[in-house]
Amino acid sequence: MSAYFRRKKMCRFSAEGGNEIDYKDINLLKNYITETGKIVPSRITGTQTRFQRQLAKAIKHARFIGLLPYCDSHR
């Protein structure tokens, strides 16, 4: 029985040249939040620590301004 081989995830931001993450780029930020509005951890996305911190800061900034929701729906 062969063991399951998990491929190493690559950091998208370091591969593109290490650009700064902008809080106004909603399409990019939506890739890193779940359907319920939570920030996806770096062990799942494969982002480096430096860029994960920038992502979290940008997502929180976009939430504060109102570009992203804090959660999916209020009941």
Swiss-Prot record:
Keyword match RNA-binding: yes
Family annotation (InterPro entries): Ribosomal_bS18, Ribosomal_bS18_CS, Ribosomal_bS18_sf
Disulfide bonds: none
Keyword terms: Ribonucleoprotein, Ribosomal protein, RNA-binding, rRNA-binding
Entries under PROSITE patterns matching the protein: RIBOSOMAL_S18
Any GO BP annotation: translation
Segments crossing the lipid bilayer: none
UniProt xrefs under Gene3D superfamilies: Ribosomal protein S18
One Pfam family hit: Ribosomal_S18
GO CC terms, sorted: cytosolic small ribosomal subunit
GO molecular function, one term: small ribosomal subunit rRNA binding
Subunit organization: Part of the 30S ribosomal subunit. Forms a tight heterodimer with protein bS6.
Alphabetical list of NCBIfam families matching this protein: S18
Family: Belongs to the bacterial ribosomal protein bS18 family.
Function, in words: Binds as a heterodimer with protein bS6 to the central domain of the 16S rRNA, where it helps stabilize the platform of the 30S subunit.
Record protein name field: Small ribosomal subunit protein bS18
Gene name, Swiss-Prot/TrEMBL: rpsR
